[in-house]
Amino acid sequence: MHIGILSRNRRLYSTRRLVEAAEARGHTARVVDTLRCYMNIASHRPSIHYKGEEIEPFDAIVPRIGASVTFYGCAVLRQFEMMSTYVLNDSVSITRSRDKLRSLQLLSRKGLGLPVTGFAHSPDDIPDLITMVKGAPLVIKLLEGTQGIGVVLAETNQAAESVIQAFMGMKANIMVQEYIKEAKGADVRCLVIGDKVVAAMKRQAAEGEFRSNLHRGGTASVIRITPEERSTAIRAAKAMGLRIAGVDLLRSNHGPVIMEVNSSPGLQGIETATGKDIAGQIIEYIEKNASTPRKAPPKPKG
């Protein structure tokens, strides 16, 4: 098979590992810079041009689209879909998962566990919004933030009100969530491929930090997840329509709650923590599914 990997940086760990895994299994792989792809939208024969030439056909595309280029990246991915190329995660599913508010609404409709989450526009509603999520301590999140950026822990109602007012004054879209104190600064990342959790790790926040993102100094270790956590992760990925996903859970007193469903999960932390060849399992999944007549991923409403 000839596999294309949409990535802006071929030196990134996840991109390198996918190329290595594809070549180790006898395939060819090409890293394609998403932002150098361009296309004639009105053409009756869909195609994509890359650095001055029409790009060659691929048997499969693995999208590694960063959050900052979601709009353009998904436009490129849609063009590959129009060319009947198998895509590991499709453009609709990626767009859906990148919208924090919409994704939580979809997960809620499926009856999956979530932290109490509030969303409001008017500063007049801030006191009631804080009460709605059980009061401080609470977490305030920018809807456009990634890797823990734009996430604030407010330890008092007064602090929460001040931070929310500041964000609203900047016309920033935010959501407010209850703080799951019993998680003790740790979350669980489940890596889902197809209908299986193939690996899981615990991410522990650094000393004095509540955000467990590895980019913020958190540490990762292998963990055994419960059947309920496994089921929750698989159902969350399915609700988003994702074939591969990193599902982040917190262990609350009332069971697992979903923090985020990531459509382009990094491989370095979880491969290092678990010792598993996740990249190889991704390529194996593509082999089993791209070689058969193309199947559309599940299309939940919303």
From Swiss-Prot:
Which keywords, in A-to-Z order, does the entry hold?
A: ATP-binding, Ligase, Magnesium, Manganese, Metal-binding, Nucleotide-binding, Protein biosynthesis
Q: Where does ATP bind?
A: K141, E178, Y179, D187, R211, S212, N213
User: Which Pfam families does this UniProt record tie to the protein?
Assistant: RimK, Rimk_N
Residue positions annotated to bind Mn(2+) 1 are D248, E260
Q: Quick one: which residues bind Mg(2+) 2?
A: E260, N262
Bilayer-spanning residue ranges: none
Necessary cofactors: Mg(2+); Mn(2+)
Example GO molecular function: ATP binding
Output this protein's name.
Probable alpha-L-glutamate ligase
Species assigned in the record:
Chromohalobacter salexigens (strain ATCC BAA-138 / DSM 3043 / CIP 106854 / NCIMB 13768 / 1H11)
This chain is encoded by the gene named rimK
